[in-house]
């Protein structure tokens, strides 16, 4: 491996990270680790909070993960800088009905004082294609971005696909400045669920996130809520870099609801 790649791994995860210890430093792990996030990371993120001044000028990004199968849920998540806001879960809706519900929720958010979103990232595979098209017809065409989890990452040398890249960014955010809802049991469990590995891609070693299908094969449910939050990291331009969070109880307004 190159010195540049090794240093980037140390910079991202620190020398105490078990994966770095084994694969970069050649040391024994302190504990088995093939997960991006652990329960401790989630707990700390749930305990953080941020004053309004820390996020009010940050980009408002919504992520919509669209259900693929009957047992899956469609989930809408909003993030603004270090804050992950309330989430909405939908079941048994076709693309048009889902788009209508999403549009109403965002409009209601704006009526409550929020700015128009800077981006609405929508899973446009399968049923998602219908929701994506209808959201454009409903007037969100200037902010909507279609996402295919299998598309090429911005940094294709380091990440196997876009989903892996978004989860990597989300994990860094969670470990550093991210403020998760204090009652996010479902989201927290999903954030800790997928495994990862590193695989050779030509001359480079790429980060590979466990697929939803592989998770289901080992009896783990689809991380729909976590995927929705990950989609708010579609672009690294929306990641807050300079904010140092205060440790406090999670804000009551950042809760998960079913819609």
Q: What residues fall within each predicted segment?
A:
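A general structural motif
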Residues: 66-69, 95
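ATPase catalytic-site recognition across NTP-hydrolyzing enzymes
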Residues: 1-64, 78, 200-204
């Amino acid at each position: 491996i190159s010195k540049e790649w090794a240093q980037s791994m140390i910079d991202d995860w620190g020398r105490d990270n078990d994966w770095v210890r084994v694969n970069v430093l050649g040391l024994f792990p302190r504990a088995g680790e093939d997960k991006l996030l652990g329960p401790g990371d989630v707990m700390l993120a749930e305990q953080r909070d941020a004053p309004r001044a820390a996020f009010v000028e940050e980009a408002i990004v919504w992520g919509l993960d669209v259900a693929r199968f009957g047992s899956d849920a469609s989930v809408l998540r909003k993030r603004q800088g270090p804050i992950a806001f309330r989430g909405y879960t939908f079941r048994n809706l076709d693309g048009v009905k889902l788009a209508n519900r999403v549009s109403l929720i965002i409009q209601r958010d704006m009526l409550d004082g929020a700015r128009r979103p800077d981006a609405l990232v929508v899973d446009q595979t399968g049923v998602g294609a219908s929701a994506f098209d209808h959201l454009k017809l409903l007037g969100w065409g200037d902010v909507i971005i279609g996402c295919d989890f299998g598309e090429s990452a911005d940094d294709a040398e380091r990440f196997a696909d876009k989903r892996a890249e978004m989860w990597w960014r989300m994990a860094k955010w969670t470990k550093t400045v991210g403020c998760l809802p204090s009652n996010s049991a479902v989201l927290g469990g999903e954030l800790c669920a997928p495994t990862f590995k590193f695989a050779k891609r030509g001359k480079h070693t790429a980060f590979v996130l466990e697929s939803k299908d592989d998770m289901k094969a080992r009896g783990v449910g689809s991380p729909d809520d976590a995927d929705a939050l990950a989609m708010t990291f579609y672009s690294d331009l929306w990641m807050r870099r300079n904010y140092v969070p205060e440790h406090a109880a999670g804000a009551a307004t950042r809760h998960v609801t079913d819609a």
